[in-house]
């Protein structure tokens, strides 16, 4: 059950495995793992696979990021930082280093929790968290309280140390030492991953509750509308007569809400990537890719400036479901019903270039 992946400077693919998830907890008795895949002879096929680290503490880690010999693993409630000191691709506690980089993220064994770390062109680290919320402190001593009506966190609606009130899911950045954290966007339902381009633009995708999944442009500092601004109410409590579900869920008629972007209905968006070079050919430069396992597809976009944001026109970049029929995500049994093989042929968790 690969949950997230990253590719290092040597072309090795690092993958987190999420076997011990919820009712399957304990299935892998030694814990979940981070695995390294290699093509050692350059023929384009994986011929080597080894476990970098396996720990009982790892339970469905939803993110991995690799920077030279430093590996960040997102495993709620912690971001764990491993340093492979001898660079042998195997974590040895007698030689290598392990530290809890940041902590305080809600909720273990939940997909609306801590997601993957990724880098920005500014040299900072970025990560997202779902609407389970978080109360975490950076290494500068600043505490951020981001709660909501999903888990009814006691700190919902409380000010963070920077003086702002943040609710719902969020995107944050921090410097490589863990200092000077910032909240860049908030009030998502459950943004699995985001990306920051070399021009500084940010994009993300967001799980829905009813059929209103979206891929969006992140305008820094903005609210994406899921909870009320004090975090006390979910969107249904404030739905106005005549509003569609996407308009109400993402509060598109409320002042201060960020434009929802491409709202495409039911699904379960996960990994996202942006192509900036010609690795996939010249036509792929500027291509935004977003995984949608619920619809058996990796969506593609070429973001085009429009007003203060971007126009996002969706197309199928890679799919096994050419008719576009939505057969259901895991929460409605889509992954467990084998009567139609379309549901199990292609359920992409992540995409990297």
Tell where the protein language model's regions lie, with residue ranges.
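Beta-propeller domains with acidic blade repeats across secreted/periplasmic ectodomains
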Residues: 1-353
